[in-house]
């Protein structure tokens, strides 16, 4: 997953995961 994007909040990460 995105373990190198700490700048993204949990909400943003979830949205990104949904996109993929």
Curated annotation (Swiss-Prot):
It holds the Pfam family UPF0181. Residues 1-20 are annotated as: Disordered. This is UPF0181 protein YoaH. InterPro entries: UPF0181. Belongs to the UPF0181 family.
